Amino acid sequence: MAISCAVGMEMQEPKMNGTLSTGAAAGYRQEREGFLPTTHGPAPGRKPVQFLDFEGKTSFGMSVFNLSNAIMGSGILGLAYAMAHTGVIFFLALLLCIALLSSYSIHLLLTCASVVGIRAYEQLGQRAFGPAGKVVVAIIICLHNVGAMSSYLFIIKSELPLVIGTFLHMDPEGDWFLKGNLLIILVSLLIILPLALMKHLGYLGYTSSLSLTCMLFFLISVIYKKFQLGCVVSHNDTVVESEPAPLQAFNSSCEAKLFTVDSQMSYTVPIMAFAFVCHPEVLPIYTELCCPTQRRMQAVANMSIGAMFIMYGLTATFGYLTFYSTVKAEMLEMYTQEDLLILCVRLAVLLAVTLTVPVVLFPIRRALQQLLFPSKAFSWPRHVAIALILLILVNILVICVPTIRDIFGFIGSTSAPSLIFILPSVFYLRIVPADMEPLFSWPKIQALCFGVLGVLFMAISLGFMFANWATGQSRMSGH
């Protein structure tokens, strides 16, 4: 339900040496009780701190759709593979931990935004560390989202020729107009670019709801195929028939692992982290949320993360219990191309990732504008040029780079822990003043430990990944 929002009184500039204006301090106290939503209202006679340069018009439900769509992405196709290399119980435990940690990190971000009245990720970096912090944050956001956009276009590049070839009864490898490189350029120009040129993110909520519907159809189909196929695989690990599996196949391949650790953890854990990154999109969605408060936005985040945790868990579990240890990094490759239901699933996934690209493009453009044009008014030529240049660069990357696996692993091991763990924790330590939270208070100790956890996660993941690259295990595993 859309509600008309009133903008609160102007907030004074906070000081970084430990003091806040009365209005800002009151607003901070109202919002700091915890990262789960509560029923406490604003203190009597006080107005909550509001963002002043934009009056949000996006409803609560549409914001949930936008953030859910920002969370849900190409990583969902690799979660069954991640479960195959961690085990059912270990995977679900890791997935739950990452979901809870993501919610906590959003709490840290929203607290910082409420304290200083800033709702742009890169501006929080500037407030915490000056111009250098702004540049570092902008670079991390751009790299992560370029990686996300690349993974979406990789899916289009690999799946769209198969879909069109199936409809036209043609060989995708033999006809020049079915080449993936040509098709991603056409999709980028005809579909993605027009959506990316919208001025406000809220309008994309309608495409977000459609995208989430497509991925829900993907989940339902994976569950259905589990019960239809059982565990039937051919010698090349691709499902060929819809008949019960022979006993020997079940004995050799169809045994679920509850807990396991192997060298592919260097890819599986980053895939899970990559699957929950939505932090660059949180503050833009917060800006456009109608009647924005920290509790209201935290409720949006909790609902979105909870829904995606359920969807991820079900998809990974039923996908893994269909293919077990033979499952590939992109689960759709396991199904036969002639299956009508899977053909519809491929269409749904293609539609979902295509409509997600414009949502991911928004924070990249915001970061570049804050970095390169901080004092410039809105300009349509600049708005269009940034979107066009970004799409050109990502298309070149997708055309030149042959595999999606190392992008998943590298982005999930570098920018993902930076955005989930490290940046929110250091922002909290630097921005929240000492008179609100002393340096050795429990919330700041928690934030410090959270940041250290992110550094350890990054170091361990990169260490395993570089070891795999050095020994050639990545290539031998088909990456």
From Swiss-Prot:
Optimum pH is 8.0. InterPro entries: AA_transpt_TM (IPR013057). Residues 82-97, 157-176, 224-264, 324-341, 405-406, 468-479 are extracellular. The chain crosses the membrane at residues 59-81, 98-118, 136-156, 177-197, 203-223, 265-285, 303-323, 342-362, 384-404, 407-427, 447-467. Keywords: Cell membrane, Disulfide bond, Glycoprotein, Membrane, Transmembrane, Transmembrane helix. Its main location: membrane. It is a multi-pass membrane protein. GO terms for molecular function: active monoatomic ion transmembrane transporter activity; alanine transmembrane transporter activity; amino acid transmembrane transporter activity; glycine transmembrane transporter activity; L-asparagine transmembrane transporter activity; L-glutamine transmembrane transporter activity; L-glutamine, sodium:proton antiporter activity; L-histidine transmembrane transporter activity. It is found in: Cell membrane. The record marks T471 as: Involved in pH-sensing to the transport activity regulation. GO terms for cellular component: plasma membrane. Not inhibited by lithium. Partial allosteric regulation on ions sodium binding. GO terms for biological process: amino acid export across plasma membrane; amino acid import across plasma membrane; asparagine transmembrane transport; glutamine transport; glycine transport; L-alanine transmembrane transport; L-glutamine import across plasma membrane; L-histidine transmembrane transport. Pfam families: Aa_trans (PF01490). It catalyses: L-serine(out) + Na(+)(out) + H(+)(in) = L-serine(in) + Na(+)(in) + H(+)(out); L-alanine(out) + Na(+)(out) + H(+)(in) = L-alanine(in) + Na(+)(in) + H(+)(out); glycine(out) + Na(+)(out) + H(+)(in) = glycine(in) + Na(+)(in) + H(+)(out); L-glutamine(out) + Na(+)(out) + H(+)(in) = L-glutamine(in) + Na(+)(in) + H(+)(out). Glycans are attached at N236. Disulfide bonds join C231-C254. Residues 1-58, 119-135, 198-202, 286-302, 363-383, 428-446 are cytoplasmic. PANTHER family: AMINO ACID TRANSPORTER (PTHR22950), SODIUM-COUPLED NEUTRAL AMINO ACID TRANSPORTER 5 (PTHR22950:SF74). This is Sodium-coupled neutral amino acid transporter 5.
